[in-house]
């Protein structure tokens, strides 16, 4: 059975965990990073340090097969898709397909809006 670690700074991870449980049986470790709540106010450098430390801690304590960064903010600000780390990002293409106008709005944290990652992600998915 796969060991999956899922984390963010709030409760958003719970919806990700629910979806994982629908598609597979896995031992899931949930880490709510309350110490660094909220992620949305952190600079890119702060976010990089927080995420690196959290991933290392999860690796050391739980040795998961997969680590899911279940927060849009670090997923958009940092390049996280390496090795066993998976991030989550808004499903822009799917959202556009579901609208008649093909125009969508994006709700984002202050840090996400300031980062080039959000702009690049929108360009890539437009």
Q: What is the meaning of each model-derived region?
A:
Residues 1-126:
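Non-catalytic structural scaffold of enzyme domains
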